[in-house]
């Protein structure tokens, strides 16, 4: 099938009517700027060692993590790419301590993880960009960090772009999930799948099994039952997957079902989890819920959590609804 038979991203935004209304022009402008930047970033990622982009940058981010060269490049590209958006009041990045004013006033706030899974860059495993867009509560007021501290229910759009064998984007505007693939000749994202859904049941889970001894009892119980297979309490065999790149693992869940888990563990008991609520958990939870799945920290739905810090961390379990319901039940019954 030729690319001319596919709807491109701009055409999709012009035609789509989430909640029965056309996407606001300012939101369209911002989403187009983000995707155009991701198209550029896809090219940079693909060049890798050929243009000297692999390896550590020798610096650390606000999270205390070693930055890869591409982390910094991706962050800079995204900031530069959205600077001209008149409706964008400000942005926040996983790589930076404080928000950055863009227009100062405006309707929207952008949050992003510029390059999720960047520890996999040098081994050529899929990585990606995750983004979330919020409506600024008072568009005319000067930008403050507190403007970003809204629950996931306030998101008006969220998505990710995964840089793999194809560069593919998943997007929700709050009315289901659609997917696009980048035509690397034209630089356009083309619609490949609408009405993406996650099956309610599954036989596949993703978790880092090497940390099993550190997990809380409800997660241990769930995984042990999966491992017991057809002869155990679940009476069916499960497969385990783990890419160690959230964007790639969640893309698999959206594409064919399953459960992704990055739970709290006892190695850092004072931290509620590893993943970032605002840059990773909220946008991925929005996508998963819109595809018919669910997302929890064990006791609460991720999207209902009220953030108190821009870089807040959280335990994450998301995917097929029956499995997430089971995990929540185990957490409540073993509490």
UniProtKB/Swiss-Prot annotation:
Mg(2+) 2 binds at residues 113, 116, 280. Its main location: cytoplasm. It is found in: Cytoplasm. Binds 2 magnesium ions per subunit. Its cofactor is Mg(2+). Substrate binds at residues 116-119, 208, 274. The keyword Protein biosynthesis does not apply. Mg(2+) 1 binds at residues 94, 113, 115. GO terms for cellular component: cytosol. Keywords: Carbohydrate metabolism, Cytoplasm, Hydrolase, Magnesium, Metal-binding. Homotetramer. Belongs to the FBPase class 1 family. HAMAP family: FBPase_class1 (MF_01855). This is Fructose-1,6-bisphosphatase class 1. It comes from Polynucleobacter asymbioticus (strain DSM 18221 / CIP 109841 / QLW-P1DMWA-1). The lineage of its organism: Bacteria, Pseudomonadati, Pseudomonadota, Betaproteobacteria, Burkholderiales.
